[in-house]
Amino acid sequence: MDAPKEIFLKNYTKPDYYFETVDLSFSLGEEKTIVSSKIKVSPRVKGSSAALVLDGHDLKLLSVKVEGKLLKEGDYQLDSRHLTLPSLPAEESFVLEIDTEIYPHKNTSLEGLYKSSGNFCTQCEAEGFRKITFYQDRPDIMAKYTCRVEGDKTLYPVLLSNGNLISQGDIEGGRHYALWEDPFKKPCYLFALVAGQLVSRDDTFTTRSGRQVSLKIWTPAEDLPKTAHAMYSLKAAMKWDEDVFGLEYDLDLFNIVAVPDFNMGAMENKSLNIFNSKLVLASPETATDADYAAILGVIGHEYFHNWTGNRVTCRDWFQLSLKEGLTVFRDQEFSSDMGSRTVKRIADVSKLRIYQFPQDAGPMAHPVRPHSYIKMDNFYTVTVYEKGAEVVRMYKTLLGTQGFRKGIDLYFERHDEQAVTCEDFFAAMRDANNADFANFLQWYSQAGTPVVKVVSSYNADARTFSLKFSQEIPPTPGQPTKEPTFIPVVVGLLDSSGKDITLSSVHHDGTVQTISGSSTILRVTKKEEEFVFSDIPERPVPSLFRGFSAPVRVETDLSNDDLFFLLAHDSDEFNRWEAGQVLARKLMLNLVSDFQQNKPLALNPKFVQGLGSVLSDSSLDKEFIAKAITLPGEGEIMDMMAVADPDAVHAVRKFVRKQLASELKEELLKIVENNRSTEAYVFDHSNMARRALKNTALAYLASLEDPAYMELALNEYKMATNLTDQFAALAALSQNPGKTRDDILADFYNKWQDDYLVVNKWFLLQSTSDIPGNVENVKKLLDHPAFDLRNPNKVYSLIGGFCGSPVNFHAKDGSGYKFLGDIVVQLDKLNPQVASRMVSAFSRWKRYDETRQGLAKAQLEMIMSANGLSENVFEIASKSLAA
């Protein structure tokens, strides 16, 4: 294997040759597939004598022609990664024809062209197209494509590719063909092909200009009934994008295909979106509310890419957040408008804190726009996506809805059908609004989560209230020193009755800004600065970073009393939730310290009262209450410790949950009883909120291990009319080891063994369990007939799930580490992308005590010494060891 090579943003150069048109032809076969490409090539500089270097991986080259002339072996250079054509016609353009042979049935990496459950399918982003044919596999090569697909008519009755269907027909030998043409220029990562035995759910959407678009969702016949929600979601997304951003669909056909073997969640290929089945298929009996919500969001996300990603794409892969950060922001807004904005915001911020903050503090920390990579697949991360979305959200916070829309409009006006950079998006936002963004671009170039400290003071004589901010970004690999960045802080001030004070003016840096309203945006751009509010009649309680206005960690001088006050009164619902979370984190950290010193644990009664009053506040959204009474996760608490202690944190969280359940059991029982329903399942916010609150209360009660509550949960399991309620009852019961748990897990499997998506949930529930010694159960499940190491969803459920139980993954004897190490080496031979996702669980090994460090390090070293290690796994393992 060649030594892994690091690619750097600073080394970007324009291509020497552009491709204008690409005509592809596929002859699909059982043993081999022949791919022919005919490309119109033009030099960037006329008369250029530069060599044309094409990427290619795992391809058998059959022939190369230039302007119809067959090249001999001495006319080109071929190695394991490239086809180089050194001497080319110097005229304005020429035609290049290449024939290759590939073997999709042997392709377990699931990138390029592969077989999934008997069907042909593609995944080309980021660099999978080079596994199909020799090509300049980079996103700034945008061309117009046609694609002719031919295959056996019985085995592959449906032949799909991008764009519009031009012609189709039968050919000899029981075969048939379809010819597709995409009128829009696109990079090769958006190419797609699907062939197989599929049926479609059909519908139409009439765009605002009156064009009728044919919509088709393709699945195997038995799954067709489960596509109704996906079609609803697609039509809702199309309407929303027109209403909110003025963006209309640009072709006459939109296809979605669901496949069971898929590395990612879904892929936005032009007019032929390919989805992981779990993000398309749903019925009340086989999918939970969380699945329905995920399908809505991801179908929105991939559809929104038609403009933010496809019509305007990335110049190079370092700019990935240009399309992904923006499109995640758009799907978050869409889901917020379809449900509860506050609850969606809480869910998104929780995800950021649980997954992205740790990444930003570990060996894989990288900016929203990375400076370098060995394997681009490793940078489809929570930093690029979720932190990237927060960066886009800050533009909207600063510019307002109308200003943000003006920026988006200018972005498309300037860059339609171009491959551009993060600076181009920044410039459109700035120029459309004549805005001063100071040092905002630092968000794209600096890794690490800023830590903002806030100190307040009140001057009763002058009736002024001051907020002093200081910001610091911790060092990250390759970035020891940081510059201050632009942090928008949305602030409100509460009076002693809990009402927002109307603000009149704020003094900052020698200027006075007049404001009117109950909240304002402070622009923090320096290492230290002060803002002084005037005409404040009494000492207020500040509500800071309303709506989580910047992706930062915040340290304030708010007392516990202030936090209880905000929990009870803040008009910003996000900050009500946040006050409860800050209190819970403080409380749990103190208890961890007590536990480590063998002191008895006791719960602050004020905390119980605070949550109790939220629980009984009928004016609050039920899903908000469910979120507000959910404790911070073990990972969040460990993140705040100098040396993470999984055993202590697990014991403390379990103690707090049981204490809350015990003290609030009457209220919790009432909630379960009052929020049951025997009516048919409806996916809407009020029903989802009702189920979320009921099931959160049920989980609390079942944690008490009281026979009466176990019976209650068992009854909920048996009486449930949908999977949301049934699975929540199953999860509540399986918290506690014993015969009841074993029996009910067996019952659930027997009921759903023929539905692979439900079985994956069954795997996940067992793998994430905190019951003692769970690694042995998970090892047994590897041999379960329903498990398959070649299927990414099953790996994410069983192995990824196990890594999500800190107490078992970080078991003191190293059994969790050894289990994962062995699996990663096996997986890497099959699917390097999935293997590198799994090895990431080791990345923060230095956060733990010396014994655990030694055990984890040994596994990383074992992985690094494996023969034929992929670049994907090498990059994560080597960076983790070097930390």
From Swiss-Prot:
Its EC number is 3.4.11.14. The record marks 385 as: Transition state stabilizer. Its cofactor is Zn(2+). The keyword Protein biosynthesis does not apply. Keywords: Aminopeptidase, Hydrolase, Metal-binding, Metalloprotease, Protease, Zinc. GO terms for biological process: proteolysis. Substrate binds at residues 125, 265-269. It holds the Pfam family DUF3458_C. Strongly inhibited by puromycin and DAMPAQ-22. Binds 1 zinc ion per subunit. CDD domains: M1_APN (cd09600). Gene3D superfamilies: 2.60.40.1840, 3.30.2010.30, Neutral Protease Domain 2 (1.10.390.10), Peptidase M1, alanyl aminopeptidase, C-terminal domain (1.25.50.10), tricorn interacting facor f3 domain (2.60.40.1730). GO terms for molecular function: alanyl aminopeptidase activity; metallopeptidase activity; zinc ion binding. InterPro entries: Aminopeptidase_N-like_N (IPR045357), Aminopeptidase_N-like_N_sf (IPR042097), PepN_Ig-like_sf (IPR038438), Peptidase_M1 (IPR001930), Peptidase_M1_dom (IPR014782), Peptidase_M1_pepN (IPR012779), Peptidase_M1_pepN_C (IPR024601), Peptidase_M1_pepN_C_sf (IPR037144). It catalyses: Release of an N-terminal amino acid, preferentially alanine, from a wide range of peptides, amides and arylamides. The active site is at residue 302. It comes from the Eukaryota. Zn(2+) binds at residues 301, 305, 324. Belongs to the peptidase M1 family. Aminopeptidase with broad substrate specificity for several peptides. Involved in proteolytic events essential for cell growth and viability. Plays an essential role during prophase I of meiosis. Required for correct meiotic reconbination in both male and female gametophytes. This is Puromycin-sensitive aminopeptidase. It comes from Arabidopsis thaliana (Mouse-ear cress).
